[in-house]
Amino acid sequence: MTGPLLPDDRIADRDAFVAFLSRLRSDYTANGPQWENPTLDRFLEALEAWVAASPAAYHNHGRDLPPDGDWTFFAHALTAARIYE
């Protein structure tokens, strides 16, 4: 499933993050039933698990883990929570 964040997207500032959140919400409106974690409870559980496992996820994709406070990292975390098991 293609999501609201492409692999090379960078979320450089608050405005870009707000635009990403709008795309994420639109993706949920259009594709929510297809998300692995369509309820808030499951989404938050997956978000927690993905953030905890994110060093391995970034390593598996050949990327360096961004520094703390990186907007793109948070966007990746929210995107991953849609499908992370």
Could you tell me what each predicted segment is?
Residues 2-52:
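Amphipathic alpha-helical packing elements
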